[in-house]
């Protein structure tokens, strides 16, 4: 679960990490009022959406007067970043930055531990730094039995700050970030940039926290911060109906029984140059009601131009699945092409049933199904 920058900064402040003064606004007039209240010569207006790349998309602007504050706030509130509409902005006091750093804690599956990542090259282009100059990213695996005691925090801090005063401040921030990570079952805690101001203060100018969805039941306070996007609302609705659904950006809707087969289906589509619109595991039922609900879910996405149904019949027989599909599509009013691949128990009976129904195009292999979907 992701949260907004302003929410992450509230958590940072609670744990003693310095952040700049800021106000959340939902209108351009509110942004002007926040600018006046701050009494600062310059403020930064930031779009509050649950995605990265806000700066490059024009969602972060520096202003120094009320007219520009109003206009830029209005522009940002009217934009969409990576398909996400901007409904709120953060007006923050502009900080005189001497240097920018990158700091994060996340899970490293190679070391099977929490890993601390730091860089003296913080800012918007940290992804480019990681690609072009990976040696500039410092990594430390954290032993879960030791954690991050003072001596380790100071040792890691000295990697970026040679002077003891700054290293001491950095060590305290590292310990606070690690505490946030562990106490809240996070999967990512990130500061980019962590700014060294002209006055020598270390301050989190941006804040990002991602929480482990599977641990949210232990943190009702964290769950209360959830601000679902439209996609997440759809995914939650699918979960309530017994599906595993993840939205993607392609145009081939996928309906599959079994997570592994669903992943393999998506891989096959990508292998042949297509783009899946979703991951959708409907489970092992041949219940036509479930198929109807799954199709409604797929057809909500206007990008979907064809549906690929890939079913493996194990305990669930393919002829039962075919009957369920026929009953379901008798209720569905759509002329979208539907490719069906059945394999497993009674697969020949299932295919014969579907061939008698003009609604379906039949494939015998997963590769054939993927190619048919791509060409449709």
Swiss-Prot record:
Taxonomic superkingdom: Bacteria
GO cellular component terms, semicolon-separated: cytosol; succinate-CoA ligase complex
PROSITE patterns (UniProt xref): ATP_GRASP (PS50975), SUCCINYL_COA_LIG_3 (PS01217)
Pfam families: ATP-grasp_2 (PF08442), Ligase_CoA (PF00549)
Chain sites annotated for binding substrate: 257, 314-316
Amino acids binding ATP: 46, 53-55, 95, 100
Domain ATP-grasp, residue spans: 9-237
Record's catalysed reaction(s): succinate + ATP + CoA = succinyl-CoA + ADP + phosphate; GTP + succinate + CoA = succinyl-CoA + GDP + phosphate
Cofactor: Mg(2+)
Keywords from the UniProt entry: ATP-binding, Ligase, Magnesium, Metal-binding, Nucleotide-binding, Tricarboxylic acid cycle
GO annotation (BP), single: tricarboxylic acid cycle
InterPro entries named among the record's database cross-references: ATP-grasp (IPR011761), ATP-grasp_succ-CoA_synth-type (IPR013650), ATP_grasp_subdomain_1 (IPR013815), Succ-CoA_synthase_bsu_CS (IPR017866), SUCC_ACL_C (IPR005811), Succ_CoA_ligase-like_bsu (IPR005809), Succinyl-CoA_synth-like (IPR016102)
Pathway(s) of this molecule: Carbohydrate metabolism; tricarboxylic acid cycle; succinate from succinyl-CoA (ligase route): step 1/1
Quaternary structure and interacting proteins, as annotated: Heterotetramer of two alpha and two beta subunits.
Biological role: Succinyl-CoA synthetase functions in the citric acid cycle (TCA), coupling the hydrolysis of succinyl-CoA to the synthesis of either ATP or GTP and thus represents the only step of substrate-level phosphorylation in the TCA. The beta subunit provides nucleotide specificity of the enzyme and binds the substrate succinate, while the binding sites for coenzyme A and phosphate are found in the alpha subunit.
Family of the protein in this entry: Belongs to the succinate/malate CoA ligase beta subunit family.
The protein, known as: Succinate--CoA ligase [ADP-forming] subunit beta
Species lineage: Bacteria, Pseudomonadati, Bacteroidota, Bacteroidia, Bacteroidales
